[in-house]
Structures are given as structure tokens and as C-alpha cells.
From Swiss-Prot:
Localisation: Cytoplasm
Lineage: Bacteria, Pseudomonadati, Pseudomonadota, Hydrogenophilia, Hydrogenophilales
Name by which UniProt lists this protein: Fructose-1,6-bisphosphatase class 1
GO cellular component terms attached to this protein's record: cytosol
Gene that encodes it: fbp
Pfam families linked to this entry: FBPase, FBPase_C
Length: 359
């Protein structure tokens, strides 16, 4: 296929920069270096089992209490080493690191902060399911001599850019700089990200939802109600049939919803009281939330906009619901106004496999 008239990521960023003549170019350089990191990670992921002999990394436990696979460590190093040197970052924070990483003194200090999940869904690698990388860019505070954790604790509304790479049948980079959402496909022959999806939009309505029903007994009543209504299909209060999906890869779930609509729920529950949510606010929910909102969807905690949440911890977890606007707003309504349009609440009442007799 000829790419003669298809913009590259570099060309796209140059065109965006022309809208702001005062811009220094640091922002473009940061995005391009993150794209380089994603290319490097894509190559490592593509080797699959063939790379096991090269991944002689001892298994460790990260700050989240989760087992780090060798590719988690390698991907984290890719992001750090390919972005620390350029002079546009003041510090970075990763899901895989306990504390922020301050840019070494031998490199110029920049104006931005980078947060990232270097390899989301890495537990799926062994079964060859799509995985990805997620990133968020914030402005560093001016006039401070040293960056601290508090400087990263900015609500999602303060993000300058957000994006993810998905490593699947093709490698794609999905990006927002606050002017809609665009998607780039990696051309394996030329090694360039090419603009293939210039205006990604999420349909307002959907007949598809994604949730892990094995956690049903831990859900709050509004979530149980929503899922019950979906499962009742045409004979229920929604008057239409729904399909259910669950990939256990946030990037893969997001990409499907951006491609054809849907709603994703990883809600707050009582499975582990110390972890009322599962997904990380700063590394996952905020960047995905910005992308979804810029694509015309809605991103929520279940109660209200996730991008307006004021973070309190670097590795804070939170309930997360996002996707087609109509469905997310319905879920918010069920949380905030439980008496609206009452329906039968018992979840899966005719499906004894999931029925919770304590409800």
C-alpha cells in the first residue's frame, strides 16, 4: 500500500505545533520519544516465547503487590531510557516503581511530568492476547528546584496529552493532545507510525458491555441493577439485547470501545476493603479517561467524572466506568438516584450460577 499521502506521526505533530507559534518543540520531542519506546516494546512483545532465553530477569513483586513479568521490567526500562535524556521532562512516575524517578543531573530538566503503565495486561502475554502501554503527560510546576510526589497529584483535567499503544495483530498508537483523538498504525516496513484513524469517535449508544461477572457478589447495588437489566435483554426494561465482553486487558477493552462503542465497568466493590477500586487513577484511569472524553464518550467513577477526582496518592486505585455516553450516564444515575425508574434488583435471579441469596 502506498503511504505517499498519509501523514506520519511526526508530520501530524508538526501541523499541531503550527497552531501554537510560541511552542518550543519540547512537547513534540517527548511524544516522538514515547513513540520510539512503544516501537521497542512492540518488538519485544512480538518475539513471544522465542524471547524467553533473552529475558533472564528475576521475577519480582512491584509496589502494587503484583508479580512483575520480565517484559514488565524491560518495558519500564524502555520508557525511562528513551525519554529521560531529551531535556523535556522534570520527572516521571511508573506503575512499576515505588517513587517518582527524577531526571538525572547530567540531562537538562524539562517542563513536563510523565506517568505511564509500561505494559498493561502483561498477564495476557502467555495466551497471546493484545497488551499495551498507557501514558499521561502533565506540566511540571514552575520555579521548583525538586519534584516531589505531590507534583504528580493533579486531576485528570490538567493533562496535556494522553495516549496508549496496543500490541496486537498490528501495533497502533492512539493519541490525544486535547483536540480529539487520532490513531496511528505502525508500518513494519518503514518503521513509521502512519495516521490511519484521523477522527476517532465513540457512538453515544451501544448494545455491548464489559465487566468481570466473577466479582458479582462484591458489587454495589447500582452495578448489579445495571448488569441485570442488560442481561434481561429485549424482555427487560432496556428493551434490547446486549452482548457481554471481557478481555482483562484495559488497552484492548478501550480499543474495542473506541472502534465500535460499548461500556466498560471495573467498579468500586467490597472484595478488598482496602482497595475499593482496582485500576490506578494516575496511570490508567486518567489517560484513558482523557482519550474517551476527547472521543465523545464519558469516563466516570460511577458517581461522577473521573477526570475531576483530586488524587491523594501516587498509586491510588479507583472504580472506573467508561464508554458510550448514554450508558455511562445511566450508570451514574443509578448510583446517584437509586429510586429512578425502579426495576427488580436481584442479579441474575433466573440464573442460579450467579445468584446471591443474601441480596
Amino acid at each position: 500500500m502506498s503511504w505517499a499521502h498519509t501523514p506520519t506521526l511526526t508530520q501530524y505533530l508538526i501541523e499541531e505545533r503550527r497552531r501554537y507559534p510560541q511552542a518550543s518543540g519540547d512537547f513534540n520531542a517527548l511524544i516522538l520519544d514515547m513513540a520510539r519506546a512503544c516501537k521497542a516494546i512492540a518488538r519485544q512483545v512480538a518475539y513471544g516465547a522465542l524471547a524467553k532465553s533473552n529475558h533472564a530477569v528475576t521475577t519480582t513483586i512491584n509496589v502494587q503487590g503484583e508479580e512483575q513479568k520480565p517484559l514488565d521490567v524491560i518495558s519500564n526500562e524502555c520508557f525511562m531510557r528513551l525519554t529521560e535524556w531529551g531535556g523535556y521532562l522534570a520527572a516521571m512516575a511508573s506503575e512499576e516503581m515505588d517513587e517518582p524517578y527524577l531526571i538525572p543531573e547530567q540531562y537538562p530538566r524539562g517542563r513536563y511530568l510523565l506517568l505511564f503503565d509500561p505494559l498493561d495486561g502483561s498477564s495476557n502475554i502467555d495466551v497471546n492476547v493484545s497488551v499495551g502501554s498507557i501514558f499521561s503527560v502533565l506540566r511540571a510546576p514552575e520555579g521548583k528546584t525538586e519534584i516531589t510526589v505531590d507534583d504528580f497529584l493533579q486531576p485528570g483535567t490538567q493533562q496535556v496529552a494522553a495516549g496508549y499503544a496496543i500490541y496486537g495483530p498490528t501495533t497502533m498508537l492512539v493519541l490525544t493532545v486535547g483536540r480529539g483523538v487520532v490513531g496511528f498504525t505502525l508500518d513494519p516496513d518503514f518503521g513509521e507510525f502512519m495516521l490511519t484513524h484521523p477522527n476517532i469517535r465513540i457512538p453515544e449508544s451501544t448494545k455491548e458491555f464489559a465487566i468481570n461477572t466473577s466479582n458479582a457478589r462484591f458489587w454495589e447495588p447500582p452495578v448489579k441493577r445495571y448488569v441485570d437489566e442488560c442481561l434481561k435483554g429485549k424482555t427487560g426494561p432496556r428493551g434490547k439485547d446486549f452482548n457481554m465482553r471481557w478481555v482483562a486487558s484495559l488497552v484492548a477493552e478501550t480499543h474495542r470501545i473506541l472502534s465500535r462503542g460499548g461500556v466498560f465497568l471495573y467498579p468500586r466493590d467490597n472484595k478488598e476493603p482496602k482497595k475499593p477500586g482496582r485500576l490506578r487513577l494516575l496511570y490508567e484511569c486518567n489517560p484513558i479517561g482523557m482519550i474517551v472524553e476527547q472521543a465523545g464518550g464519558r469516563a466516570s467513577t460511577g458517581y461522577g467524572p473521573v477526570l475531576e477526582v483530586q488524587p491523594t496518592e501516587l498509586h491510588q486505585r479507583i472504580g472506573f466506568v467508561f464508554g458510550s455516553r448514554e450508558e455511562v450516564e445511566r450508570i451514574e444515575q443509578y448510583h446517584n438516584d437509586p429510586d429512578a425508574s425502579p426495576v427488580d434488583l436481584p442479579l441474575f435471579a433466573e440464573r442460579t450460577l450467579f445468584r446471591d441469596e443474601t441480596l
